[in-house]
Amino acid sequence: MKKLVSIIVGGTGQFGIITSQLLLKKNYKVIVTTRSTKNKNKKIKQNKKLILYKLNIYNKKEIKSLLYKFKPNIVFYYAGQSSPAKSFTNKRETYRSNFLGCKNFLEVIHKNNYNCKFLNASSCEIFGRINNKIKISSLKKPVNPYGLSKLKSFEITK
């Protein structure tokens, strides 16, 4: 039986590390992408089963090459600026990393007919200030640039 392949984009953060550990336990081949292969988390560097892959999420040729090389069954998109507070002072990078990077992946997957699942990690920040139980159908009204960037990536992913 052929081994299942996963790519974790932005996989050196908290979600990426946890996801990679779970997938390795399920015997997946796991590729973790990062902006730089220097000074990364010890758990990532020490795990010889993980493949660490340098990737520019704004370069569609690099994305295409990654997908062609590894032919993943699933792509997890965890890349991006993750602080609502920092998003006010770094609006451009927040938008680019959370929305444009995600959009680039989806466009490359669609254009090249790659047969893989795509999971984009969203955030409760897409709903803004809400006091009720949140449902997927709840009104989406982000109150910061981070929430807006995550909402835009959520909308193009669904």
Language-model regions: role of each:
Residues 4-26:
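N-terminal Rossmann NAD(P)H-binding glycine-rich loop of SDR-like oxidoreductase domains
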Residues 33-38, 57:
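N-terminal Rossmann-fold cofactor-binding loop
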Residues 47-59:
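Rossmann-fold cofactor-recognition segment
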Residues 57-96:
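NAD(P)H-binding glycine-rich loop region in Rossmannoid oxidoreductase-like domains
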Residues 62, 100-108, 156:
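Conserved mid-core alpha-helix of short-chain dehydrogenase/reductase
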Residues 77, 103-145:
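Conserved Rossmann-fold NAD(P)-dependent oxidoreductase catalytic core, especially the SDR/UDP-sugar
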Residues 145, 149-152:
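Active-site helix of classical SDR
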